[in-house]
Amino acid sequence: MSKVIGIDLGTTNSAVAVMEGGESVIVPNSEGNRTTPSIVAFTKDGERLVGETAKRQAITNPDRTITSIKREMGTEYKVNIDGKDYTPEEISAMILQKLKADTESYLGEEVTEAVITVPAYFTDSQRQATKNAGKIAGLNVKRIINEPTAAALAYGIDKETDQHKVMVYDLGGGTFDVSILEVGDGVFEVLATRGNNRLGGDDFDEKLLNYLADEFMKQNGVDLRKDPTSKQRLKDAAENAKKELSTRVSTNVNLPFISAVNGTPVHLNMDITRSKFDELTSDLVEESLKPVRQALEDAGLSHNDIEKVLLVGGSTRIPAVQEAVKKLIGKNPQKDINPDECVAIGAALQGGVLTGEVKDLLLLDVTPLSLGIETLGGVCTKLIERNTTIPTKKSQVFTTAADGQTSVEIKVLQGEREMAADNTLLGQFNLTEIPAAPRGVPQIEVTFDIDANGIVNVSAKDLGSGKQQAMTITSSTKMSDDEIKRKVDEASKYAEEDKNKKETIETKNSAESVIYQVEKTIKDLGDKVSETEKSDINSKIEALKSILDSGDNKDIKAKTDELTQEMYKLSSKLYENNAQQPGASQEAKKDDDVVDADYEVVDDDENK
């Protein structure tokens, strides 16, 4: 059975893991790193860059570099590059394609199936968008699982037989989740989950960026945020300073030639202490504790009931974050696994469960938000409460609001507010051909069915006539199957283009190498190569050079082969020339004194 890989599609960094020999291992990317920046860039000549290469050129190409696209998943947001609109799903698919290709290179086999993680507090629209991104990238997404649950798997707490309660605090680059789980004997039951899809490491960077920009403006009267290149340099510096302050009490931000005042270059040079950084970001740390308190309340627990605290996400390296969690729960958080890698490791373990490679492990996750429909007066009537274990199915009977009503509009909502307008509209459909009757007489059964991915299916049935209508809630971006197929085809085309581009570069490099070797050999042989031979070879060299930039790999390879044959002839000439040198015969004479060893021919038949 083919491998089901585990992917942590992160806001700032992504990772991929796979089961090998019964263990979940991180797959290094083509650059040799264990995580890949979730960054996509388009160069001015149309080349598409993903990951490390995209990040390296961000300062010089900020307007065509896309970061933190995960925050826009499930929305109508578009990125316009050269007049073409890209959806968040498409950009995410480019990142997934890179992870897929790196894994295939690592394994030496094709990969088509994956488990992808999402923040526990992702809505149905965001989950569906993630699944669509996987489809565009050429992956069959076998399961969408919540990041905190995946992290809990990675910590290996399933190996403990005693039941105990665990809190997973997951602060990533762009999102925050907290989940309370009861685990033991291979069973993971999520009791409650809360979160904030707009809180993460990016916000900590932004606080420091704004402080640096404000201080610079006070001193020089220039707002660095108004220039894209200066802002990108400042952003990178803020991120690096944040990382350094996780292990040091102070750091220096030094950006020479960051701007100019009246034609004179000005530089930014500023010392930042950890205490200053903590002061700037204290409101963000406090903001992360609110969902923790809410999750404890939802689970009906106090902080004393929590036996283990797991920290997940790169932003949990911030000392103030660790201290705040420790102070609230009263326990030292576990830090015995890489917070950037544990989610992907857990996702691969879930992939192992699906293939049968990992046994005796059961995930019981929950839906993060309540689901319901709009009823008379614009009220949201909930059918499935938040923190209900999934998969789940719930039905409720409704009736008509007017005499003779022959159709009803079912508006599917997600959220905790009492009024429909204050919640997220996931989708709507009509149930028609209801027999006319006085209001209150028809019986319409509405059923919500949530699968293990957290994706919602809704149906409505008139119990009198048996008439039924159903729908699967799709992403709010409303990508149809045809649109997704078109995006898949485009992604495949790009993958083929990337492959062809690589082949073209390798073919050109090979040709240039042969040209160099031939020219060097001619030079080494000097006048031992006749002018006629030189002229013939040089004409072949020029013919090859003239088509190097044509992109015609077949022609380049053919002419390279011709030139290679000429190189072999020259090499033979070089060896012949060396053999005819006076020294060669002298060496032969010296060998006349060599004594031949005696030997006896043994007939094998005699020894049988």
Swiss-Prot record:
Q: Does the keyword ATP-binding apply?
A: yes
Which InterPro entries does the UniProt entry name for this protein?
ATPase_NBD, Chaperone_DnaK, Heat_shock_70_CS, HSP70_C_sf, HSP70_peptide-bd_sf, Hsp_70_fam
What positions are modified (Phosphothreonine)? Answer: 175
* Superkingdom of source: Bacteria
PROSITE patterns per UniProt: HSP70_1, HSP70_2, HSP70_3
Q: Does the keyword Nuclease apply?
A: no
GO molecular function terms listed in the Swiss-Prot or TrEMBL record: ATP binding; ATP-dependent protein folding chaperone; unfolded protein binding
Function noted in UniProt: Acts as a chaperone.
Q: Which family does it belong to?
A: Belongs to the heat shock protein 70 family.
Q: What is this protein's record name?
A: Chaperone protein DnaK
